[in-house]
């Protein structure tokens, strides 16, 4: 599975979560954190998709995705430990931890594999 197949939906989920946090609680931190990280993740996914279309890999995009997902895992994990609230801290930490593992796997296996041309 290519990283952008999960990255773009993950980024959209972060953006939507940031907006929901802002609408429900008026939290500017949720809006900035969710929308900011979500936009960066979507951008990295888009860069990875465009590289794949050119039959190249984008290590930089995958590294950016990994750093963001790992940071969200840590920050939201700490928040969960302090508040014990499943929504949104544990949910975001859990999804981000899964994404971090996926990205580390993609980096370890050489990124998106480009299928050979059929002749």
Swiss-Prot record:
Function: May be involved in free fatty acids export.
BP GO annotations: cellular response to hypoxia
Name of one Pfam family that matches: Tmemb_14
Miscellaneous comment as given in the Swiss-Prot or TrEMBL entry: For all TMEM14 proteins, 4 hydrophobic alpha-helical domains are predicted. However, NMR structure determination of the human TMEM14A showed that only 3 of these helices are membrane-spaning while the amphiphilic N-terminal helix is probably located at the lipid micelle-water interface.
GO CC annotation terms, alphabetical: membrane
Keywords: Membrane, Transmembrane, Transmembrane helix
Organism expressing this protein natively: Arabidopsis thaliana
Protein name: Protein FATTY ACID EXPORT 5
Family: Belongs to the TMEM14 family.
Residue ranges crossing the lipid bilayer per the database entry: 27-47, 57-77, 85-105
InterPro entries with a match to the protein in the record: TMEM14, TMEM14_sf
Domain of life: Eukaryota
UniProt subcellular location: Membrane
Entry keyword annotation includes Signal: no
Major subcellular location class: membrane
Membrane topology of this protein: Multi-pass membrane protein
